[in-house]
């Protein structure tokens, strides 16, 4: 009897073993097929295959969580409907002919055409554009504009961190809401998680400020949506007339990540007046409706004010939103076209340098065909993974003649590109795969030499606070560092 019992247990264990083995192979086979049949770059596919075969079960789970661009079905359906509606709004905007640019420089012409074809809207004019590169000046300017707001204040931020200047912004927002100004905030659930749980948010909501938590982190949705898909835009809109965008989150650098020992974050923000704000607000209204279901679109820029923008010396701008469901891949196309458009000089600043193969080759080719190429990156960054992955690209860039400047004055967070002193791109997009293909981002393109000169002055100042990396010096680094670099290089398509 006892022998039969143990025999039955043994049979049961054998059955369980085979079930687990078959389940394991089914999972690996299923994930492998999904990787191979998804449209992705070869390096990305190879990196994922390595992960699931080196750490099979865990690797497969990681892929299901982070490897595919999944959104909830309801959100996908809502997004499509809203963006179709946005195209109709854009067509209405075309009736305001005075606000659109008709001529561009030879450097920018193809880029503006590309954006018009992909997004359905061409470049728009801006009456005034200022570059603000001092955080105190940025915050003071924002506070002044909020105090003068009469109709609406709308903001999108990835990070909203309390302390210092940010607390003053909260105070003036509450005052604005109390005097009848409509205030709407979209804050990313991950980047602003501490602020969203704070007492400040409760007070703001009581005063009438609407605050939406974008892409909510929910453990129940872990297999339905990528948790690392984030709302990475930084935008401020006031009265549908003033707009801000750039790389700066709603933070006071003196109070943000003080314990990381990497210095204060260095950013720029662009303040604009005029029709460009209407183009930016279409993006905000779509994001708001996707998150809340509320349609807040209203008439664009007041054409009665167009007596100024008819002049030829106004700024020609293009607002470029990017992210899932929003002209997918457009920002990658824009960056490639901008790099290939360079004839004399190309200056790029980015905190995270993990480019796609196409962008890497475009940068190297630009240098090899005689363009002076400068890349400014921070010497110290807040991500060990990105640090080593970035270093894996240095050799190829240096051999191509690209000058790499390592900024030592803090964490350089500015994302900017300047082409031949004429064409400028500033915004939230890092030179990494997450910004290029995953996150919701915004980029401002400006076709104006005076603006380019101002941006170049800031970039030149960054260079003065940087150390140039020389090929001879780089070639002497220890072999253990080279091994780590090559390891992270293989996984760079996933960062």
Swiss-Prot record:
The active site is at residues 232, 234, 239, 413, 415, 420. The keyword Cell membrane applies. Its EC number is 2.7.8.-. It is a multi-pass membrane protein. One of its GO terms (biological process) is cardiolipin biosynthetic process. The keyword Transcription does not apply. One of its GO terms (cellular component) is plasma membrane. PROSITE patterns: PLD. Its main location: membrane. Keywords: Cell membrane, Lipid biosynthesis, Lipid metabolism, Membrane, Phospholipid biosynthesis, Phospholipid metabolism, Repeat, Transferase, Transmembrane, Transmembrane helix. InterPro entries: Cardiolipin_synthase, CL_synthase_A, CLS_N, PLD-like_dom, PLipase_D/transphosphatidylase. It catalyses: 2 a 1,2-diacyl-sn-glycero-3-phospho-(1'-sn-glycerol) = a cardiolipin + glycerol. It is an enzyme of class 2 (transferase). SUPFAM superfamilies: Phospholipase D/nuclease. GO terms for molecular function: cardiolipin synthase activity. Catalyzes the reversible phosphatidyl group transfer from one phosphatidylglycerol molecule to another to form cardiolipin (CL) (diphosphatidylglycerol) and glycerol. Belongs to the phospholipase D family. Cardiolipin synthase subfamily. ClsA sub-subfamily. NCBIfam families: bac_cardiolipin. This is Cardiolipin synthase A. It comes from Wigglesworthia glossinidia brevipalpis. The lineage of its organism: Bacteria, Pseudomonadati, Pseudomonadota, Gammaproteobacteria, Enterobacterales. The gene is clsA.
